[in-house]
Amino acid sequence: MTDKKALAEMLSRNRLFDELTKKDVRALVNSAMEVEHREGRTIVVEGNPGVGFHLIIDGTAIVSRNGRKLRTLGPGETFGDIAVIDGGPRSASVKAETRLRTLSLPQWEFKPLLLKHPQLAYKMLVKLCALLREAEKRPPV
């Protein structure tokens, strides 16, 4: 198990959370749990409802859409960022390429955290808007 200070540091380096205060990041880490996924396990299925957010601690994962590989994720990267907020369907599938450890934050833990820390919700909203604008500028795949 990874110590919470190291997890908080890893989370704060992620572009979605890099502007949060140390207190906000600690609150996220304290509400999350570490999960181990075996190699080859499908963690997220495209089209299924989103129930949580994952920060990769160790290992690699493959992101695919319509059976086509989009990218590989590694330590410090996340998936499920938007689904944890809106619970909407997953836009892609994610499969453990190697043994994978993630810090997982389910939606039911995340929502009360946002209500308790409204500044966290605002900071994430601003960051998600920036990510959306960036995505809109990319050519279609």
Q: Residues of each region from the PLM?
A:
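Cytosolic regulatory regions built on CNB/CRP/Popeye-like sensor folds
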Residues: 1-141
